[in-house]
From Swiss-Prot:
NCBIfam families: ruvA
Self-association state and partner proteins as the record states: Homotetramer. Forms an RuvA(8)-RuvB(12)-Holliday junction (HJ) complex. HJ DNA is sandwiched between 2 RuvA tetramers; dsDNA enters through RuvA and exits via RuvB. An RuvB hexamer assembles on each DNA strand where it exits the tetramer. Each RuvB hexamer is contacted by two RuvA subunits (via domain III) on 2 adjacent RuvB subunits; this complex drives branch migration. In the full resolvosome a probable DNA-RuvA(4)-RuvB(12)-RuvC(2) complex forms which resolves the HJ.
Name of the protein in its database record: Holliday junction branch migration complex subunit RuvA
Swiss-Prot/TrEMBL domain comment: Has three domains with a flexible linker between the domains II and III and assumes an 'L' shape. Domain III is highly mobile and contacts RuvB.
InterPro entries associated with the record: DNA_helicase_Holl-junc_RuvA_I, Hlx-hairpin-Hlx_DNA-bd_motif, NA-bd_OB-fold, RuvA, RuvA_2-like, RuvA_C, RuvA_C_sf
Gene Ontology terms, MF aspect: ATP binding; four-way junction DNA binding; four-way junction helicase activity
Lineage: Bacteria, Pseudomonadati, Thermodesulfobacteriota, Desulfovibrionia, Desulfovibrionales
Region Domain I, annotated ranges: 1-65
Top-level division of the source organism's lineage: Bacteria
Family as reported in the entry's similarity comment: Belongs to the RuvA family.
GO cellular component labels: cytoplasm; Holliday junction helicase complex; Holliday junction resolvase complex
Region described as Domain II: spans on this chain: 66-144
Function: The RuvA-RuvB-RuvC complex processes Holliday junction (HJ) DNA during genetic recombination and DNA repair, while the RuvA-RuvB complex plays an important role in the rescue of blocked DNA replication forks via replication fork reversal (RFR). RuvA specifically binds to HJ cruciform DNA, conferring on it an open structure. The RuvB hexamer acts as an ATP-dependent pump, pulling dsDNA into and through the RuvAB complex. HJ branch migration allows RuvC to scan DNA until it finds its consensus sequence, where it cleaves and resolves the cruciform DNA.
Length: 203
């Protein structure tokens, strides 16, 4: 079972990346949106904690920049009828702290914004996660060690806002990454304004 990978970033798409290990083997890892958007340039060294999903017809690897994100992912897939793809979609929208807050508030409406999760599924997921709150709390306490650039919630809110304005993810991710690198305390609204200015300057 593969649990940890270190190597060079070979290629990346909007859902996954390929890591070339020192032994010359390339592994494709499925990543969250926030992990994809903070990937360095091709050829850079990268490290991911890995969860392996082995089935008769597939061997899928899910990568996470820190240990705690992987543990939250494992907590999610322990919920009945919640597979790895949907769990990854949830973590693409919400970090450990956000998810803990959703469970505490029983916020069905907010969780239902995740593609593929309707109100009925959201209610079942939140109910199931109540029994697993200790894992979420532990991950929240240690989440400062997770090497994600900028604030994940603000980054994703800014990305969502620009998407609603008609911009594609590929068009604005690099702008937002640079913006949060330069001003990590910026909120989503401020990041959107700066991004729009940069986009207009590059036309």
């Amino acid at each position: 079972m593969i649990a940890y990978i270190h190597g060079k970033l070979l290629e990346a798409t909007d859902k996954s990346c390929i890591i070339l290990t020192p032994g010359g083997v390339g592994y494709e890892l499925f990543l969250t949106l926030s992990a994809i958007s903070t990937l360095p340039e091709s050829g850079s060294d990268v490290t991911f904690y890995v969860h392996s999903v082995i089935r008769e017809d597939a061997f899928d690897l899910y990568g996470f920049p820190c240990f705690d994100d992987r543990e939250v992912f494992r907590t999610l897939i322990s919920v009945d009828r919640l597979g790895p793809k949907k769990a990854l979609a949830i973590l693409s929208q919400f970090g450990p702290k956000d998810l803990q807050d959703l469970v505490f508030r029983e916020d069905v409406k907010t969780l239902s914004i995740v593609p593929g999760i309707g109100p009925k599924s959201a209610r079942q997921i939140l109910w199931s996660l109540k029994d697993k709150m200790e894992t979420l709390k532990s991950a929240t306490v240690r989440s400062g060690a997770c090497p994600v650039e900028g604030d994940r919630s603000e980054f994703l809110d800014a990305l969502s806002g620009l998407r609603n304005l008609g911009y594609g993810d590929d068009e604005v991710r690099d702008f937002l990454k640079d913006i949060f690198d330069e001003e990590p305390d910026l909120d989503a609204g401020g990041a959107i304004r700066v991004a729009l200015k940069k986009i207009s300057q590059n036309k």
